[in-house]
């Protein structure tokens, strides 16, 4: 809601929201309701599992999430944003202390396969 408020204050067609399902899982009471509220200002969507790993391997309800994106006619980008190896600089910056996935190449392949069911 804060992001939508900021968009309304700026009131420019090039200003919108990037929703990140990993963070929405932490911050939002209902991910799908939040997506519906963002409908007209949703410009980009980040996907990862609840542990930042392979989508579909954890607790997030991606069937409902992607059904909601379909309901609002979202046609923008969907980007994987996984931080799966602890020994990389980005993971150090995020304080990722353990490997989420052992093989990053397999993780990308499996994630792509999973997302291709929806998008």
Locate each region found by the language model:
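Histidine-acidic metal/acid-base catalytic patches
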Residues: 1-19, 23-119
